[in-house]
């Protein structure tokens, strides 16, 4: 029989309290758009602040139109983004063109702002192979559908950038559910061991489809999981674009200076369903919770901040919305005009030099498609 110790070896309360204090939520703008952390204000010009707002407004319009197009049967798979604009757009706003983006399936907006033509984003939703072909000058992979798998890929891409002497980072995104996957831990551990220039963004929107974050992990925060991998972790108000930008900009600077990766947890909320494939949020979250997070809308918050500085107006936002709708209209027209994909198209892009057995199949399908 094991002997009992007179005193606990580990003071669990002290340990957990220390972790909680270490990962307090970083915020610059409160829900009213007021600056509550002047010392942390990022060095952005007025034009840059307006551009950040323009991109967020465009992304909200894109989400609304994409939902409408999906309901019309003109788009296929779609994961709504409303509510997560600060977490998505402000992180990307801190990047440079040479940085490498590895998105999840909800992160198409970041790809668009990184250079993916909008019409190709629509083709991706339709399952057309052209939607997965990044232009040569766009450093990115197409959205990862396997939850969390992009974390391992990001560690590898980041290490490659380091070995090539590039002053660039690899950044990836997942939700809170992705942080429960084994690939998540492998990715941050590998990146930490090799001090790879990576940024891991976990958009904690509170639900892994329908599973609340409290039932996914006993950890007080997702950010604290960085400690086990020996990397920096930070929890950010994911509805505050300035806080999200500042945290990402600092993480990027640290990475390119050889100080290793960062795990950023953004506290955010998706206003819509998990995807447009039949998910009903009313089955697993209350109206009270939805109302609480609607009061934290990143666009409302940032709009108030900019209006207070005299940098934004209703007229200016209306113009952005009008331009966005027209750009989306033209992009969907271009997507509609894309030739229907054929089996031979898919076979052509599989190998640089087609194997003999596929050459035979290629000829068979070529004849079928010519009829």
From Swiss-Prot:
Q: What is this protein called?
A: Pyruvate dehydrogenase E1 component subunit alpha
Kindly give the NCBIfam families that the UniProt entry links to this protein: PDH_E1_alph_x (TIGR03181)
Q: How does it assemble?
A: Heterodimer of an alpha and a beta chain.
Regulation of activity is described as: Activity of the E1 module is inhibited by the pyruvate dehydrogenase inhibitor PdhI.
Its function, per the record, reads:
The pyruvate dehydrogenase complex catalyzes the overall conversion of pyruvate to acetyl-CoA and CO(2). It contains multiple copies of three enzymatic components: pyruvate dehydrogenase (E1), dihydrolipoamide acetyltransferase (E2) and lipoamide dehydrogenase (E3). The B.subtilis PDH complex also possesses branched-chain 2-oxoacid dehydrogenase (BCDH) activity.
Q: Which PANTHER family match?
A: 2-OXOISOVALERATE DEHYDROGENASE SUBUNIT ALPHA, MITOCHONDRIAL
Q: Which UniProt keywords apply?
A: Oxidoreductase, Pyruvate, Thiamine pyrophosphate
Reaction catalysed by this chain?
N(6)-[(R)-lipoyl]-L-lysyl-[protein] + pyruvate + H(+) = N(6)-[(R)-S(8)-acetyldihydrolipoyl]-L-lysyl-[protein] + CO2
According to the UniProt record, what class of enzyme is this? Answer: oxidoreductase
Gene Ontology biological process: pyruvate decarboxylation to acetyl-CoA
Q: What GO molecular function annotations does the UniProt record carry, in alphabetical order? A: pyruvate dehydrogenase (acetyl-transferring) activity
Tell me the CDD domains matching this sequence. Answer: TPP_E1_PDC_ADC_BCADC
| This protein's record includes keyword Oxidoreductase | yes
What is the scientific name of the source organism?
Answer: Bacillus subtilis (strain 168)
Q: State the InterPro entries in the record.
A: Alpha-ketoacid_DH_E1_comp (IPR050771), DH_E1 (IPR001017), PdhA/BkdA (IPR017596), THDP-binding (IPR029061)
Cofactor section: thiamine diphosphate
According to its UniProt record, the EC number is 1.2.4.1
Organism domain of life:
Bacteria
